[in-house]
A protein has these predicted regions:
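Phosphate-bearing ligand-interacting subdomains
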Residues: 22-25, 128-214
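N-terminal Rossmann-fold NAD(P) dinucleotide-binding loop
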Residues: 95
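NAD(P)-binding Rossmann-fold cofactor-contacting core
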Residues: 105-127
């Protein structure tokens, strides 16, 4: 693959390809055409071919795609061929829900620590990982091989905690705090606003009702 910039739109579609290909594997499907894959994913076949051509193509004329091979290769592109140790800061409802999501570990995201300020949660184990207090966070991060930190904390604390994590070697932050984090360019940040998708759904409902007179 050429060393060139891949658009965020293409990268954003890769997890969908990976997920659908995993479903096909589970169903025992060995190969699939771009046309059949497009029907399943509700994108055009040409879009699929263009996306995959960014990484070398993977398909054969008249054969389509080998599902297992394509699944494996997209997994490599997404970095899922090696484990990623992660911690969650904030063990409230959202933090615990993330910790309980077993598919993360299936894809190589290994939960190593949970942290919170609520002393009543200290020692409570989520899938075998005990909740620790925030005053342990700095030492834990500096002494552990942690790659990703998920923030499920109030936005008023997000910058302070993010800066401390960066000072202690964290280079990737999955941010669920209700604010966008603007951090140094060498820090990888994925800002997630759960309400955004709900607002898009609300917009679609409103347009549908207007178009159909409801």
């Amino acid at each position: 693959m050429e060393d060139r910039e891949i658009s965020r739109a293409v990268i954003g579609r890769l997890p969908r390809y990976y997920r659908y290909l995993g479903e096909l594997l589970d169903a025992g499907v060995e190969r699939i055409s771009s046309n059949d894959l497009s029907k399943k994913m509700h994108v055009t076949a040409s879009q699929i071919r263009q996306d995959l051509n960014n990484f070398g193509g993977f398909g054969q004329q008249g054969y389509g795609y080998n599902v297992k091979y394509l699944y494996t290769e997209i997994g490599k592109i997404l970095g899922l061929n090696r484990p990623h140790n992660m911690i969650i800061i904030g063990a409230g409802n959202l933090g615990q829900a993330l910790a309980n999501y077993a598919s993360f570990e299936k894809n190589g995201f290994i939960l190593k620590g949970l942290f919170d300020v609520n002393s009543r949660l200290e020692g409570v184990a989520i899938r075998g990982v005990p909740i620790r207090m925030m005053d342990e966070l700095k030492d834990f991060v500096s002494q552990s091989d942690i790659e990703i930190a998920a923030l499920t904390i109030p936005k008023s604390k997000a910058i302070e905690v993010a800066e401390m994590l960066i000072e202690n070697g964290i280079r990737a932050i999955w941010n669920f705090a209700h604010t966008d984090l603007n951090l140094p360019e060498d820090i990888i940040v994925e800002n997630v606003h759960l309400s955004d998708s709900l607002m898009r759904l609300s917009y679609t409902i409103s347009r549908y009702q207007e178009d159909h007179g409801k």
